[in-house]
Amino acid sequence: MLNLTPAEPVIAYRKFHFVDNSNWIYLHNNMRVYANIDMDSDNGLGFRMQSDKNDSISLQNMNVELSRFQLGELSEVLPYMPRLTGLFSAEAQYIQTPTSLQVSAEANIDELTYERQHVGDIGMGATWLPGDKGATHYLNTYFSYDNREVMTADGILTQKNGKARWK
């Protein structure tokens, strides 16, 4: 087991603290990663990486989240990057079983501005789900603007005779 130290790490000039001693990662000999990391900073930025220890069916079951990352801080330190502001948050879940893989991710930016021009609230997400016996996979995506869904795309990937085909 790997315990992350110190108790209040400084990352990118920001002081974090672990919530309720949630500061460990464990790599089992079967290559499954177990984790319980919950870090918050003084300005609300958070990072979480957690696995379900009670899940005995999946080979891997992991959630990762980054919340309230201030884009303005990034554009101030990267040369030639356009001036962006807003709060970026993202969450992803990865579940792997012996026969299938499921992935979902969502990201949003609240109050996005680009070169001091208001853009709005932007959100997007995607989900990849297994189908019948690994021969079919489903994809669902969306894009939102100011909390209204403005675009969706769904797809089905099928395999027949070793060749993949999108519907």
What role is predicted for each listed range?
Residues 1-167:
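Interface amphipathic segments
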